[in-house]
């Protein structure tokens, strides 16, 4: 049965049915295509193939309702847009701008996994710019301000992925929190004579603030502090 929180977010949905039933539960037309392994053909109920060819992203149903059901759909829209080089529909754009704050209703643990999907790819900088443009970034990284360092780091990550080189979320989160950590360190150092203690305290405070939005595994926070 479908269960929702007071905010309208769907917290449980284990209703199963036909393809026709399933398709209306999908988020975007381009993400609602089915393949018949016997007939070797694509089944398209909502015009997903047409949208793929036109490089457009339309939501299934009413955007305002669908985003309130699952706010993560907003950042999925951004990711699909950058990955496919597709344009968001006017309805999707408008509703993301209006409902960006709903992302705060999502559990920090789930947002950690979503952040990896957002930034560990060849189009991560484009994703970053779009998240900022639509007011979503601050609901993932409220301590992070746009700067050239992040741009260089994301472009470097993209280049490594293209070259089939390994990437790590340690580097990703350290970069996003670097400026906030440095600013906090400067403030603490005015009162704390020990460089090491000031650096450690600044790192811990910034990470504590971050995990309120996006959970970070303990092994990850330890390595972020090392960086």
Where do the PLM segments sit?
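Catalytic cores of the polymerase beta-like nucleotidyltransferase superfamily
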Residues: 1-227
């Amino acid at each position: 049965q479908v269960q929702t929180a007071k905010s309208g977010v769907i917290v449980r949905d284990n209703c199963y049915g036909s393809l026709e039933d399933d398709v209306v539960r999908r988020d975007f037309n381009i993400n609602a295509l089915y393949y018949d392994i016997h007939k070797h053909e694509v089944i398209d109920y909502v015009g997903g193939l047409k949208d793929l060819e036109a490089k457009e992203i339309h939501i299934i149903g009413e955007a305002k309702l669908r985003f309130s059901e699952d706010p993560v759909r907003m950042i999925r829209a951004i990711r699909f847009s950058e990955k496919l080089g597709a344009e968001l529909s006017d309805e999707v754009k408008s509703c993301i701008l209006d409902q960006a704050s709903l992302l705060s209703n999502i559990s920090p643990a789930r947002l950690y996994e979503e952040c990896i999907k957002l930034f560990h790819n060849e189009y991560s900088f484009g994703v970053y710019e779009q998240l900022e443009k639509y007011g979503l970034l601050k609901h993932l990284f409220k301590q992070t301000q746009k700067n050239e360092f992040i741009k260089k780091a994301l472009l470097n990550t993209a280049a490594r992925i293209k070259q089939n080189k390994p990437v790590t979320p340690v580097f990703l989160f350290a970069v996003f929190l670097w400026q906030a950590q440095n600013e906090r360190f400067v403030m603490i150092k005015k009162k704390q004579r020990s460089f090491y203690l000031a650096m450690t305290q600044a790192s811990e405070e910034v990470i504590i603030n971050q995990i309120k939005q996006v959970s970070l595994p303990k092994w990850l926070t330890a390595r972020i502090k090392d960086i």
